[in-house]
Amino acid sequence: MDIAIQHPWFKRTLGPFYPSRLFDQFFGEGLFEYDLLPFLSSTISPYYRQSLFRSVLDSGVSEVRSDRDKFVIFLDVKHFSPEDLTVKVQEDFVEIHGKHNERQDDHGYISREFHRRYRLPSNVDQTALSCSLSADGMLTFSGPKIPSGMDAGHSERAIPVSREEKPSSAPSS
């Protein structure tokens, strides 16, 4: 039995009509149009594995910025209130923990919990750290950087979460 071997670029041109990727065979090669249209890919082939792109967007997305003057973490926590969040600094790490007990929604009961841990740069002034929650559910953790050679004051302490009434100015990813 003869099997025709096709060049990969030929299969890619037929991508939306003939998905050639099974079980992440081409992992790391980027996203194509049919990766962003999950309803189309599931109707074409029952063996085609859906992209993980959607699950990444549904999880709490965070962004870390560190420039010359300050260190900032943006974290989407829209399902949590300030009372559900705990922000703590231990040594060179900031730990953000969110948990709310079981609540009833349209489909039954739901509970959520997450734990994030970020390494702080060594030159962040830990005595001037702040944390706020915007009206649209974006948690902003920030701290100024100090000139090198000065003591950053490493200790364990809790950072209170304040609520802001305006939406976040963080870029949407």
Curated annotation (Swiss-Prot):
Chain residues that bind Zn(2+) 2: 107
Glycan attachment residues as annotated in the record: 162
GO CC field: cytoplasm; nucleus
Modified residues (N6-acetyllysine): 70, 99
Span list, region Required for complex formation with BFSP1 and BFSP2: 1-63
GO-annotated molecular function: metal ion binding; structural constituent of eye lens; unfolded protein binding
Swiss-Prot/TrEMBL GO biological process terms: lens development in camera-type eye; negative regulation of apoptotic process; protein refolding; response to heat
Modified residues (Deamidated glutamine): 6, 50, 90
Record keywords: Acetylation, Chaperone, Cytoplasm, Eye lens protein, Glycoprotein, Metal-binding, Methylation, Nucleus, Phosphoprotein, Zinc
Subcellular location as annotated: Cytoplasm; Nucleus
Major location (coarse): cytoplasm
In-chain residues carrying the UniProt-annotated modification Deamidated asparagine: 101, 123
Positions of modified residues (Phosphoserine): 45, 122
Domain sHSP positions: 52-162
Entry-annotated residues carrying N-acetylmethionine: 1
Family from the record: Belongs to the small heat shock protein (HSP20) family.
Oligomer and partners: Heteromer composed of three CRYAA and one CRYAB subunits. Inter-subunit bridging via zinc ions enhances stability, which is crucial as there is no protein turn over in the lens. Can also form homodimers and homotetramers (dimers of dimers) which serve as the building blocks of homooligomers. Within homooligomers, the zinc-binding motif is created from residues of 3 different molecules. His-100 and Glu-102 from one molecule are ligands of the zinc ion, and His-107 and His-154 residues from additional molecules complete the site with tetrahedral coordination geometry.
Name by which UniProt lists this protein: Alpha-crystallin A chain
Originating organism: Ceratotherium simum (White rhinoceros)
